[in-house]
Amino acid sequence: EALLSHLETVDIKEDTEKGFYMPVQRVCRPNHEFRGFQGQIENGAIRAGDLVTTLPSKEEAHVKSILVGDKEVQEAVQGQPVTIQLDREVDVSRGCVLTIDSGAVLTDSVEADILWMDDNALTDGKNFFVKIGTKMIPGLVTKINYSVDVNTGEKKSAYTLKKNEIASCTLEFSEKIVVDEFDRHRTLGELILIDRVTNM
């Protein structure tokens, strides 16, 4: 079967991401009267007046204004970079998440599927910087649960992980952070392990 004709028959998977969420990339405070949270909307839409929840602080505030560039708008949607001003002070910094009904969770440990790309093997007990969304924190690989045969999908017992191998690993973080399953929220469901010495 030709590739083009096959692609024409493929059933496109429905987008399963829920609610609104925006990882905060930067806090903008040009003067004492304005404090805006900048980032890209990863899912959903936000409108002036909406009630948002801040994570991990779990505070609630209403949207006072939304800026796209230097233009104030009443609504912004997925994919747009925005500055959001809230109607009261909240405990938010880079790496925090603004959300409405997203169902994202706070946790200090996850089980993640890892594709290992380093020449040196991965072993239990290795420390990393872990980047999820706009947040980067210290983390630890506490256990390699099993590796996955890329040809058969078979799960195999594993104690180390070599370059280009895939495994399920348990990770612990230095603090509770906002995460979710990749199928539910892509940005909050993917992570990068960064070597604390080489930054690679």
Would you name each region that the model predicts?
Residues 32-200:
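C-terminal effector/interaction modules appended to NTPase cores
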Residues 1-19, 23-28:
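Canonical P-loop GTPase G-domain recognition
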